[in-house]
Amino acid sequence: MAKKSMVAREAKRQKIVDRYAEKRAALKAAGDYEGLSKLPRNASPTRLHNRCRVTGRPHSVYRKFGLSRIAFRELAHKGQIPGVTKASW
């Protein structure tokens, strides 16, 4: 389980990215790189990191499900992820 402060920091970054998305796109299209540099650092989407929605784990997160490999495996075994079954051939 990740620290709550790290999960909160990531959520805060996401809000800032959403808030400045249109302004960033307009500045980028106009080629105003000085204006871009005056925006907050956390307004850049490259500063975001995918985290597991269940555990907050930052590594090995499947984008399609938003879960880490560990949480995905546990939920899949319990049958709580629709359409996911254990492979057998």
UniProtKB/Swiss-Prot annotation:
Part of the 30S ribosomal subunit. Contacts proteins S3 and S10. The keyword Cytoplasm does not apply. This is Small ribosomal subunit protein uS14. NCBIfam families: PRK08881.1 (NF006477). It comes from the Bacteria. Keywords: Ribonucleoprotein, Ribosomal protein, RNA-binding, rRNA-binding. The keyword Acetylation does not apply. Pfam families: Ribosomal_S14. Belongs to the universal ribosomal protein uS14 family. It comes from Streptococcus pneumoniae serotype 4 (strain ATCC BAA-334 / TIGR4). One of its GO terms (molecular function) is rRNA binding. Binds 16S rRNA, required for the assembly of 30S particles and may also be responsible for determining the conformation of the 16S rRNA at the A site. PANTHER family: 30S RIBOSOMAL PROTEIN S14 (PTHR19836), SMALL RIBOSOMAL SUBUNIT PROTEIN US14M (PTHR19836:SF19). Coiled coil: none annotated. GO terms for biological process: translation. One of its GO terms (cellular component) is cytoplasm.
